[in-house]
Amino acid sequence: MQLIRGLHNANRVLQGCALTIGNFDGVHLGHQTVLRHLRQKADELNLPMAVLLFESQPREYFMGKNAPARLMRLRDKIYYLEKAKVDVVIVAKFDRTFAEQLADVFIEQTLVNHLHVKFLSIGDDFKFGSKRQGNFAMLQAASKRFGFIVEDNRSFCLDAQRISSTAIREALANDDLQLAENLLGKPYRIFGRVIHGNKLGRTIGFPTANIRLHRQVNPIKGVYAVKVRLKSGEIFNGVANMGKRPTINGLMQLLEVHLFDFSQNIYGQMVEVEFCHKIRNEIKFPSFDDLKVQIEKDVETAKAFFNS
């Protein structure tokens, strides 16, 4: 798969494509269905299959710190898009210039001149251009003028529930990990690099692997039973805390994982943390000793979950 950063670079690579556009946050079951269909159409038309992503995501640009939490960072999206057999991912910078671009300019400059689109699969509720004035009807009209095919990719449902990134965020916020997994088509996971921390956990008998988070707004908070996959492919059970660590007056979001029966040095490694079961919410304890007692209980709860 080829990754292209910046629309200006796409013009040198693409001479026609079957394209879809979106955030693809979570690359959930609905996204996966769209991608399978687009793969089929690209093969039928003998075109490369392309996905256009925006960075930052539009709502992050407009809403700033009030934007919804991401389900996954860009690097992880690209990983799952490659698994879906996408040929080309174009990452376009979403900034003021792009946000103020007129809808007809987006069609002619971005879709036609830069991406040379021949087939476009897009939601019929897709809005684009300054003040969201562009819509599916405008794309249909433009397709006749510029000679490309456009079709709508409808919403997909699971047990009458629309599959969407918003629905998955709500499931995670409600501690319904099973529903989130059903909508995602995979367990909810976070990927990150193990970094050095203040090593307070080892002073109370619970050393932790601290996972760097590239965002301070996350869709989950609290203490969880987790599975951690290392670079080697080994999988270890553990207990994790996602939060600001109020007992030590922490200010930044951090993912801390205590692995059971583990003694390896994994500093600097990329690891995959799969969230299996919510144990409790994050609490500020009166003392470090009280925290230690609770962690002992959390470990027993997690071990009981994995043994059940």
Swiss-Prot record:
Pathway: Cofactor biosynthesis; FAD biosynthesis; FAD from FMN: step 1/1; Cofactor biosynthesis; FMN biosynthesis; FMN from riboflavin (ATP route): step 1/1. Belongs to the RibF family. InterPro entries: Cyt_trans-like, FAD_synthase, Riboflavin_kinase, Riboflavin_kinase_bac, Riboflavin_kinase_bac/euk, Riboflavin_kinase_dom_sf, Rossmann-like_a/b/a_fold. Gene3D superfamilies: HUPs, Riboflavin kinase-like. The lineage of its organism: Bacteria, Pseudomonadati, Pseudomonadota, Gammaproteobacteria, Pasteurellales. Its EC number is 2.7.1.26, 2.7.7.2. The keyword Flavoprotein applies. Pfam families: FAD_syn, Flavokinase. It comes from Haemophilus influenzae (strain ATCC 51907 / DSM 11121 / KW20 / Rd). This is Bifunctional riboflavin kinase/FMN adenylyltransferase. It catalyses: riboflavin + ATP = FMN + ADP + H(+); FMN + ATP + H(+) = FAD + diphosphate.
